[in-house]
């Protein structure tokens, strides 16, 4: 008897219909005619001196538009890949799309009118989405609360745990490299120095400890002074450091931020003024220190004069997290996607400074944007170098926001919240782009890939998810953890993702 297959389900029919209509769209003939296109820089809103071009509809593909734009900007010999948006960052043209099928045929524009296409440069390298667990390593005896990759490459990752230890993992072999003991309470924060030569840790015992990540040995004495637990750590940007004297900022529930001379083993200065728990500290590339607090404010300090510059007010509840548009380049200093390390100290300093200035310069000015995430379910975008007034307030989350982060190229902003969602925003003006829906529990943390094309998120639902930033769709679902995932990091070289949580296992993910 011949095998009989069951009839297709409604879902299969729907998918088949969608696929056939998609194929029909792609094969439909592009009519004769042309369209006028104006290119506008998405970052500055300026069209520079670029002329309006009349382009045949049949030739108006993203590939050809890339070639045209590079020629107009005299970059033919050293082409940059660009992404194009129509009217707002919500309508990105796909890498293989054309203006006719993306805009004219759906009725978004008429071929008779001038079409404004915003452009944003993309990374010249491409990161692949992690899709499998390469290693699940046991060792910690309690919840894993923090993980961070070395800025140098993805071969080493540090983790901090409720078992009072800091561990460094060899991600190439999936084995532990060092176990650092000394803390007498939960380790809540770990942070590599920008040149990857030192590792800082802090937590419930109110002490900051500095470690040599190559040997696993402690450097100097514990840094003592805080009267309550430490909430976050941030190193002074490499290009601002005095040679051989790196400094570290630590924030605490005691309401203060302390700046430490880690080699001298002493406090440099203390910043007090908050009336509640200081939840996060960031050290900007111009020397400003940014702090958020449960007193509903953000304070901006000058690290040179050790004084308060601004108090930023606007949130109606605790401020849980901060992010700077330059976080990625400050974290990685002179390390970039090429893997080439400058030979001399002067060259390292120059490269770190030029990477920061390139990332922060808009219209010839250094612009460092700040995003603040609050318990009041909103995010506020600021330009704190020039004004204490907010650029915009972003609303949409239904519950408190845990985490906020900028993409490495500074064009996108992602927020993770207790409403089970990650939301994506334009980092220029705060416009809402996408809601990333798939998690079924609160999302604790999110991080971008080095090329800004992908985002990973970790949740109470025990999973990691990887998202495509162009479409806002989920690219990979990564189950494996047996309990909540608290900590997540994507290596600066884009090769690996590290995660940890309540199941006490460090997991290393890769393509």
Q: Where is each model-derived feature located?
A:
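WD40/WD-repeat beta-propeller blade N-cap
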Residues: 137-144, 181-187, 223-230, 272-278, ...
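A conserved positional marker within WD40/Gbeta-like beta-propeller blades
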Residues: 165, 207, 227, 256, ...
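Loop/turn segments within WD40 beta-propeller blades
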Residues: 148-154, 173, 190-197, 215, ...
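WD40-repeat beta-propellers
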Residues: 147, 166-169, 190, 202, ...
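Conserved strand-to-loop turn within each blade of WD40 beta-propeller repeats
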Residues: 159-163, 201-205, 213, 250-254, ...
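A structural motif specific to WD40 beta-propellers
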Residues: 132-135, 175-178, 217-221, 266-269, ...
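Intrinsically disordered, low-complexity acidic/Ser/Thr/Pro-rich linker and tail segments
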Residues: 2-46, 54-145, 154-155, 327-368
């Amino acid at each position: 008897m011949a095998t009989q297959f069951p009839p297709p389900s409604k879902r299969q029919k729907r998918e088949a219909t969608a696929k056939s209509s998609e194929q029909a769209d792609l094969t439909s003939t592009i009519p004769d005619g042309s369209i006028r296109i104006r290119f506008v820089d998405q970052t500055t809103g300026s069209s520079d001196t670029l002329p309006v071009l009349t382009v045949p509809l049949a030739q108006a593909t993203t590939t050809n538009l890339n070639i045209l734009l590079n020629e107009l900007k005299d970059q033919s010999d050293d082409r940059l890949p660009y992404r194009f948006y129509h009217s707002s960052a919500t309508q990105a043209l796909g890498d293989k799309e054309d203006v006719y099928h993306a805009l004219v045929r759906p009725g978004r524009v008429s071929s008779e009118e001038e079409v404004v296409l915003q452009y944003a440069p993309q990374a010249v390298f491409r990161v692949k989405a992690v899709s499998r667990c390469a290693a699940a390593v046991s060792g910690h005896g309690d919840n894993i609360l923090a993980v961070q990759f070395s800025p140098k490459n993805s071969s080493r990752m540090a983790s901090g745990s409720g078992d009072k230890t800091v561990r460094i993992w060899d991600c190439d072999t999936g084995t532990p490299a060092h176990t650092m003991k000394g803390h007498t309470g939960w380790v809540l924060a770990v942070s590599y120095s920008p040149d990857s030569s030192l590792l800082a840790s802090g937590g419930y015992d109110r002490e900051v400890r500095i470690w040599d990540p190559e040997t696993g040995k402690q450097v100097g004495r514990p840094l003592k002074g805080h009267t309550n637990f430490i909430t976050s750590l941030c190193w002074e940007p490499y290009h601002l450091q005095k040679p051989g004297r790196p400094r570290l900022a630590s924030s605490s529930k005691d309401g203060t931020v302390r700046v430490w001379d880690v080699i001298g083993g002493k406090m440099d200065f203390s910043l007090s003024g908050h009336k509640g728990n200081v939840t996060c500290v960031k050290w900007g590339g111009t020397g400003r220190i940014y702090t958020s607090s449960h007193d509903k404010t953000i304070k901006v300090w000058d690290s040179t004069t050790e004084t308060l510059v601004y108090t930023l007010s606007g949130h109606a509840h605790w401020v849980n997290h901060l992010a700077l548009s330059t976080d990625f380049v400050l974290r990685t200093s002179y390390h970039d996607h090429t893997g080439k390390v400058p030979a001399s100290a002067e060259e390292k300093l120059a490269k770190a400074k030029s990477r920061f200035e390139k990332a922060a310069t808009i219209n010839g000015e250094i612009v460092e944007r700040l995003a603040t995430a609050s318990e009041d379910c909103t995010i506020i975008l600021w330009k704190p170098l020039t004004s204490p007034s907010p650029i915009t307030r972003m609303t949409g989350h239904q519950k408190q926001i845990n985490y906020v982060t900028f993409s490495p190229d500074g064009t996108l902003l992602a927020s993770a919240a207790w409403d089970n969602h990650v939301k994506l925003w334009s980092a220029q003006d705060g416009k809402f782009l996408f809601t990333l829906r798939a998690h079924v529990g609160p999302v604790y943390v999110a991080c971008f890939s080095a090329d800004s094309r992908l985002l990973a998120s970790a949740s109470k639902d025990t999973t990691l998810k990887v998202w495509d930033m162009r479409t806002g769709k989920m690219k990979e679902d990564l189950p494996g953890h047996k309990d909540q995932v608290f900590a997540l990091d994507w290596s600066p070289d884009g090769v690996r993702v590290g995660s940890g949580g309540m199941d006490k296992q460090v997991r290393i993910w890769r393509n």
